[in-house]
């Protein structure tokens, strides 16, 4: 770099931002002839004015969203001094405005791939609203600069150099980012007061950065534009015809006074160094226009320096603030640009899989964009399902949440009453027909029931999740991850018992903390074990026998082991098994059992976790057994916490699918409702509530009847999340009401008794108490209850009217008949209207009990309020376990009542709504990771069995088309 050029850079960097400093000494732009006729257009003054305007805009943004700051990143490869000067100027201007500007300096050795990766990281960073790549690239290896500028997201290309933004400008779409120097030129022309429309404009120079975009901007400002360049003939004649002359040819003082039309506006974009012995620096800055001559002819003229240069930086800042404003606008935008899928209901209504196959789902990436997700927040699993990154919660942390609706049911028949179908009909009605931002949030179904008797759980008829095969089978593998994590813990538990029984303390300790390359070191999880034991030493070689013995030996009591292996199929022969029968296990065997995967405590942990850190802590806290002194043994004690978290890391991200009408559906976690809390994940609901925004709706469901799933949704899930539901939808059917009125048993696979296919008002009247108890259950939590009567073809209008009248008299907010199974969202519009009105009532939600109550008192509160029981009675074994859990510090946890789903009582054969009965609690255990104490009311199996004729008989794969057949 020449000494003359270095002096030029110093002069350039010192060029003042304050207009008051211009006009004396070294800063004078030809002061001797400043008194002549042309008006000087001060870019410095205009840029200062723009910066002040931008500073006010940034201040307003921070008031609109607390702590919001526009972000600019300036990427530089190498360390060219001229680039450093320009970067410092940009950062100085940004800081003055209130923009968070950072210099991302990368080494000369960087490769094109590495540079593209860095730019992609910035593209995906929500804190960054503008990115510029400083040119030229000062690199050791060849890098395609055009590819680099096009790698910057068009939405963050504040230099305006991306091909997309250039193309938008070329066709007159000025909604993209405009190149900074040409935009600055246009602003200077406008501020001169000269009318652009109809004027003759000549642009001298055709560079990508200045000449070409300047010509386009003038053209779309309605000037008549001619572009000239080094090959243009009669150049002087053409420029002399211009009312507006923009010069960026790169030749010092090329344009003479004779080239300029008298009174013309002349914008000089050039900057050159010219020797000048009269200057202390030995040189001066000049433009592409002979300034002295132009002053005599032009009407308006920009100086060099102090003309276009400051405007380039100012317009860069303006683009950055503009980008940040668009980000804020998208964040605050209330209405999704959702393209719904039309339904064409057929009569008679076809099977679920035929309906699902007839509807072509939209690409899941399209749906994700429609609902406001950024590409970096979505991991695609093919074209129809995706995972959503938890980073979306950080991006939307300040966004107001929508209305929260829980769909529950009356005590169901073995056939189910259509909660999921009603939920899907409701969200299709809200999203596709009422045009409200609406998200369904569902549990992922277990494969066990899918291949057993119940079938799938995607909804039914014209109110479904699609593709239903993906939904009902593997989806994205979350349940498999839960199974793997659960069984890893089970394997470590039995293995630890084996090793402790076959080794003495010292040998056990030496194997747990081995010397690696001559050095022994505790792992982080072992340090936590030491801390739990009150041992402060960190050097393994310093522990005494009294210290390393308790550290190495968990001393698990096999009779207290609560942890079971799992598999996600119905297998009755795994309900009781013996493990450790191989001779290699040296006679250390025990009786245990398998549960179905969704019954694992890890599934409940997944559903109740609020973050990765929260999940990891919950996994650590899981109690697998008690030691021989009665102290709890945890997953952390077994050293397995980190490994479990690794297996479950991706499973914590909710899955995105869609309804038959193209509205979004979140599918995540699937704990059973009779043995766990029976709700989808807190994280899925939270993501949904943020995405739908203030006026939107997230509709989720709670398993089985309100006495089971909804009670746990409120007392466990909402207590954990801190969210308060705005309304409860109570799903009922005439069929279920008749059953509770004394109707014949409803048996899967068997024809319905004619009591259910003919009008029978007497049975309906007798069965209403069951429905009314469920209405009371919702009211006990302060929620407005909307009864949705899921219409069946055998129902009669008189039966419907009887149910609606009774529901309203019992205090339901509304009672409507819904036909979503046959009609899709259109059949649930009345339900949607009722839900909207219910959510406008104001939130009066309250919990049922305080955690400080003793465990048995909490059980009694649930049983008497939710079930109508007189009291709970604990078996001696349950009483002993309550005492043990209370002594161990678990007395302040919420209660998860595990009981049959087909009755308010502990006996599934007792229907209706009995009062004052005794509820027997046979067993009590803690799910410390999930954060609740389970009370077992009677025998509830955690491993279903296959029926005589399971659904597998009808399920097949068409090897010609690859389609799955027979799912329902």
UniProtKB/Swiss-Prot annotation:
GO terms for cellular component: cytoplasm; cytosol; mitochondrion. InterPro entries: Aminoacid_DH-like_N_sf, Formate_THF_ligase, Formate_THF_ligase_CS, NAD(P)-bd_dom_sf, P-loop_NTPase, THF_DH/CycHdrlase, THF_DH/CycHdrlase_cat_dom, THF_DH/CycHdrlase_CS. Pfam families: FTHFS (PF01268), THF_DHG_CYH (PF00763), THF_DHG_CYH_C (PF02882). GO terms for biological process: amino acid biosynthetic process; L-histidine biosynthetic process; methionine biosynthetic process; purine nucleotide biosynthetic process; tetrahydrofolate interconversion; tetrahydrofolate metabolic process. Signal peptide: none annotated. Residues 1-338 are annotated as: Methylenetetrahydrofolate dehydrogenase and cyclohydrolase. This is C-1-tetrahydrofolate synthase, cytoplasmic. It comes from Drosophila melanogaster (Fruit fly). One of its GO terms (molecular function) is methenyltetrahydrofolate cyclohydrolase activity. Pathway: One-carbon metabolism; tetrahydrofolate interconversion. Keywords: Amino-acid biosynthesis, ATP-binding, Cytoplasm, Histidine biosynthesis, Hydrolase, Ligase, Methionine biosynthesis, Multifunctional enzyme, NADP, Nucleotide-binding, One-carbon metabolism, Oxidoreductase, Purine biosynthesis. The gene is pug. Residues 339-968 are annotated as: Formyltetrahydrofolate synthetase.
């Amino acid at each position: 770099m020449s000494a003359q050029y270095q002096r030029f850079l110093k002069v350039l960097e010192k060029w003042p931002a304050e207009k008051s400093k211009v006009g004396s000494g070294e800063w004078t732009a030809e002061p001797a002839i400043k008194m002549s006729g042309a008006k000087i257009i001060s870019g410095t003054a205009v840029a200062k004015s723009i910066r002040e305007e931008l500073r006010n805009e940034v201040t307003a943004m921070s008031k609109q969203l607390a702590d919001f700051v526009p972000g600019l990143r300036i990427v530089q490869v190498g360390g060219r001094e001229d680039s450093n000067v320009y970067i410092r100027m940009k950062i100085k201007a940004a800081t003055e405005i209130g923009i968070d500007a950072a210099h991302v300096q990368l080494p000369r050795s960087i490769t094109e791939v590495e540079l593209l990766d860095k730019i992609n990281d910035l593209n995906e960073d929500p804190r960054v609203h503008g990115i510029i790549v400083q040119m030229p690239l000062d690199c050791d290896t060849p890098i395609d600069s055009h590819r680099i500028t096009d790698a910057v997201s068009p939405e963050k290309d504040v230099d305006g150099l991306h091909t997309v933004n250039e193309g938008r400008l070329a066709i007159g779409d000025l909604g993209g980012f405009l190149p900074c120097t040409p935009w600055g030129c246009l602003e200077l022309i406008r501020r001169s007061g000269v009318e652009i429309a109809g004027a003759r404009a000549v642009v001298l120079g055709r560079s990508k950065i200045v000449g070409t975009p300047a010509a386009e901007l003038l053209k779309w400002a309605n000037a008549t534009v001619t572009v000239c360049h080094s090959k243009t003939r009669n150049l002087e004649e053409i420029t002399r015809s211009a009312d507006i002359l923009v010069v960026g040819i790169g030749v010092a003082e090329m344009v003479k006074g004779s080239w300029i039309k008298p009174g013309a506006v002349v914008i000089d974009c050039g900057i050159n160094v010219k020797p000048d012995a009269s200057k202390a620096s030995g040189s001066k800055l000049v433009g592409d226009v002979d300034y002295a001559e132009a002053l005599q002819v032009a009407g308006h003229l920009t100086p060099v320096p102090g003309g276009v240069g400051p405007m380039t930086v100012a317009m860069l800042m303006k683009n950055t603030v503009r980008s940040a404003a668009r980000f804020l606008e998208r964040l605050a935008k209330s209405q999704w640009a959702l393209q719904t899928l039309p339904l064409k209901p057929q009569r008679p209504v076809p099977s679920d899989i035929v309906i699902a196959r007839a509807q072509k789902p939209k690409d899941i990436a399209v749906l994700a964009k429609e609902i406001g997700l950024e590409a970096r927040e979505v991991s695609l699993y093919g074209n129809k399902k995706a995972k959503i990154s938890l980073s979306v919660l950080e991006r939307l942390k300040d966004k107001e949440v929508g209305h929260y609706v829980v769909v529950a049911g009356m005590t169901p028949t073995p056939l189910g009453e259509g909660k999921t179908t009603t939920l899907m009909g409701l969200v299709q009605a809200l999203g596709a027909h009422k045009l409200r931002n609406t998200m369904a949030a569902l549990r992922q179904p277990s494969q066990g029931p899918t291949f057993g008797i119940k079938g799938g759980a995607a909804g039914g008829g014209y109110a479904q999740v699609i593709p239903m095969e993906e939904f009902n089978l593997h989806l994205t593998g979350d349940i498999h991850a839960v199974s793997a994590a659960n069984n890893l813990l089970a394997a470590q538990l039995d293995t630890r018992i084996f090793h402790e029984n076959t080794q003495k303390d010292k040998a056990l300790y030496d194997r747990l903390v081995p010397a690696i390359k001559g050095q022994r070191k505790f792992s982080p999880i072992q340090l936590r074990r030491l801390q739990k034991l009150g041992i402060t030493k960190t050097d393994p070689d310093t522990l005494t026998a009294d210290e390393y013995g308790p550290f190495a030996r968990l001393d698990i009591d096999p009779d207290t082991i609560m942890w079971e292996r799992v598999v996600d199929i119905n297998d009755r022969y795994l309900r009781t098994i013996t493990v450790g029968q191989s001779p290699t296990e040296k006679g250390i065997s025990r009786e245990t059992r398998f549960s179905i995967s969704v019954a694992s405590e890890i599934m409940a942990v997944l559903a109740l976790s609020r973050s990765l850190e929260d999940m990891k802590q919950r996994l650590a806290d899981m109690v697998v057994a008690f030691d021989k002194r009665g102290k709890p043994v945890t997953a952390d004690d077994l050293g397995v916490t980190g490994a479990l978290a690794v297996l479950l890391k991706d499973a914590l991200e909710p899955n995105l699918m869609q309804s038959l009408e193209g509205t979004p559906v979140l599918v995540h976690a699937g704990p059973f409702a009779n043995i766990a809390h029976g709700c989808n994940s807190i994280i899925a609901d939270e993501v949904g509530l943020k995405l739908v925004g203030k006026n939107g709706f997230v509709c989720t469901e709670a398993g089985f009847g309100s006495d089971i799933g909804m009670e746990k949704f409120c007392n466990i899930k909402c207590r954990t999340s801190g969210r308060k539901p705005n309304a409860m939808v109570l799903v009922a059917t005439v069929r279920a009401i008749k059953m509770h009125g004394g109707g014949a048993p409803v048996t899967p696979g068997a024809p319905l008794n004619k009591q259910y296919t003919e009008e029978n008002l007497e049975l309906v009247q007798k069965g209403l108490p069951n429905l009314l108890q469920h209405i009371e259950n919702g009211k006990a939590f302060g929620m407005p209850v909307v009864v949705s009567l899921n219409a069946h073809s055998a129902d009669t209008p008189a039966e419907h009217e009887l149910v609606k009248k009774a529901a309203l008299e019992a205090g339901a907010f509304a009672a409507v008949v819904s036909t979503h199974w046959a009609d899709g969202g259109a059949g649930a519009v009345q339900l949607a209207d009722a839900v909207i009105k219910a959510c406008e009532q104001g939130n009066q939600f309250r919990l049922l009990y305080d955690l400080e109550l003793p465990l048995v008192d909490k059980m009694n509160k649930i049983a008497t309020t939710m079930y109508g029981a007189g009291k709970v009675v604990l078996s001696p074994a349950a009483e002993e376990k309550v005492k043990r859990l209370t002594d161990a510090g678990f007395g302040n946890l919420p209660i998860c009542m595990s009981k049959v789903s087909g009755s308010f009582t502990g006996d599934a054969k007792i229907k209706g709504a009995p009062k004052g009965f005794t509820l027997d609690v046979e067993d009590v255990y803690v799910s410390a990771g999930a954060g609740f104490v389970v009370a077992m009311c009677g025998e509830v199996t955690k491993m279903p069995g296959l029926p005589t004729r399971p659904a597998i008989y009808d399920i097949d794969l068409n090897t010609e088309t690859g389609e799955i057949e027979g799912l329902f």
